[in-house]
């Protein structure tokens, strides 16, 4: 069985899930390869693809003329025009918004010919949707790592509701491009990372009638260590007598993560001994003396220290396709307070935390509830490992690939 995974990159959160799945498949004896636009590791089973040759040739003078034309706002092709239009809007509104038109004709790569099954992952900015679904006739599995496959350019439906007015023309155009491309494909199956993601797909006209299997994201427990709480606090320089909450996001200004609501919840709790550890880009002003901003962290050992030092991990997101930080915290034995989104809706219960609403008062009440309970940290980690360990996830994918090939 030859499986080709296609993704924008082997790095980042989505890339980590892909690579855990890929390596676990290799351990099962599957001939698994990865094709990316941006390679961040030295893994020999990963191939990096460069953009297509310039449509006007490789003559250096022609290339120079194109660059000058682009700076003047002129366009030679659909790729140039769509990305010029996106850039104009994103200068004013900095949100993820991607075109289905790219400079990569992935369908013609030799690894596509090599594979028995092609597994798409996060492909925004890499795979040219129209040419790929037109030319590839092999079985395709698309792992939904966010909601972009079922939208035009937006990556989350909640963001679309807020910013549709500014992007309406492009969103409608991109949605029609995707719809036409995917409707012409008879060999597509979907993998949803959670029940909520599957429900989203069921509401998209061109995805609803596709076979859709729920397989959780692969997250390795070996990457996250359950430190003793006081040891973790000592290493991070945190008072062992404090009550510690933690919060993680890419950047604090990302409204979907509800950082502002968490700060208000901290005020509602009204205890000067409660400290909030925040991981992410500090791009908003923080005046509370009870907030400890740690900046962005990529080192998994240090992230393990943050989770392990916490009495509660708080993640009241408005929307998540999966929510891997929930699993990371559970691997460290830390109970979680989360809204009922992504994977949290399925796994958070009285044994490992609490679900909450998205208002500051609801978040504060759930934090109080969790702080008032006692938890078995070892059991929290064990149950999470059963669900999300890469070897367990890989077996489910192996069964899915086999079923598709038999049919």
Name each model-derived stretch.
Residues 374-399, 403:
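A short, well-ordered alpha-helix in the C-terminal region of glycosyltransferases
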Residues 350, 354-360, 369-374:
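Conserved acidic donor-binding segment of nucleotide-sugar-dependent glycosyltransferases
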Residues 280-304:
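Nucleotide-activated donor-binding/catalytic signature segment of Leloir-type glycosyltransferases, i.e.
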Residues 335-338:
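Short hydrophobic beta-strand element within catalytic cores of glycosyltransferases
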Residues 107-108, 135, 148, 159-191, ...:
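Membrane-proximal helix-turn-helix segments that form the acceptor-binding/catalytic region
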Residues 318:
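Aromatic "clamp/platform" in nucleotide-sugar-dependent glycosyltransferases that forms part
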Residues 305-310:
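Short alpha-helical donor nucleotide-sugar binding micro-motif in glycosyltransferases
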Residues 191, 239-257, 263:
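Conserved donor-binding/catalytic core segment of Leloir-type glycosyltransferases
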């Amino acid at each position: 069985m030859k499986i080709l995974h296609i993704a924008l990159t082997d790095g980042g959160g989505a890339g980590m899930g892909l690579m855990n799945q890929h390596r676990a498949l290799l351990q099962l004896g599957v001939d698994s390869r990865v094709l990316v636009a941006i390679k961040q590791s030295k893994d020999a089973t990963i191939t990096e693809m460069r953009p297509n040759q310039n449509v006007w040739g490789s003559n250096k003078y022609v290339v120079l003329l194109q660059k000058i034309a682009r700076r003047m706002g002129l366009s030679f092709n659909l790729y140039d025009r769509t990305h010029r239009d996106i850039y104009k809007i994103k200068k004013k509104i900095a949100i993820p918004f991607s075109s289905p038109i790219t400079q990569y004709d992935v369908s013609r790569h030799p690894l596509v010919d090599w594979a028995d099954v092609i597994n798409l992952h996060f492909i925004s900015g890499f795979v040219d949707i129209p040419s790929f679904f037109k030319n590839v006739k092999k079985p395709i599995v698309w792992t939904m790592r966010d909601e972009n496959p079922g939208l035009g350019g937006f990556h989350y439906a909640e963001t679309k509701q807020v910013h549709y007015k500014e992007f309406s023309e492009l969103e409608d155009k991109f949605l029609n491009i995707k719809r036409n491309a995917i409707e012409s494909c008879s060999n597509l199956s979907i993998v949803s990372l959670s029940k909520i993601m599957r429900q989203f797909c069921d509401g998209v006209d061109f995805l609803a009638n596709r076979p859709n299997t729920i397989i959780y994201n692969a997250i390795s427990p070996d990457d996250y260590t359950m430190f003793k709480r006081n040891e973790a606090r000592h290493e991070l320089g945190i008072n062992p007598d404090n009550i510690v909450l933690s919060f993680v996001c890419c950047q604090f200004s990302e409204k979907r993560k509800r950082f502002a609501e968490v700060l208000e919840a901290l005020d509602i709790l009204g205890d000067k001994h409660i400290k909030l550890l925040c991981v992410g880009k500090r791009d908003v002003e923080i005046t509370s003396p009870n907030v400890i901003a740690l900046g962005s962290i990529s080192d998994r050992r240090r992230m393990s220290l943050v989770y392990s030092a916490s009495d509660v991990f708080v993640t009241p997101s408005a929307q998540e396709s999966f929510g891997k930080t929930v699993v990371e915290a559970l691997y460290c034995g830390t109970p979680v307070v989360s809204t009922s989104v992504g994977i949290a809706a399925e796994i958070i219960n009285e044994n490992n935390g609490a679900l909450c609403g998205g208002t500051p008062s609801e978040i504060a009440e759930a934090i109080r509830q969790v702080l008032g309970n006692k938890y078995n940290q070892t059991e929290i980690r064990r149950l999470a490992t059963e669900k999300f360990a890469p070897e367990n996830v890989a077996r489910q994918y192996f069964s899915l690939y086999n079923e598709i090939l038999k049919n």
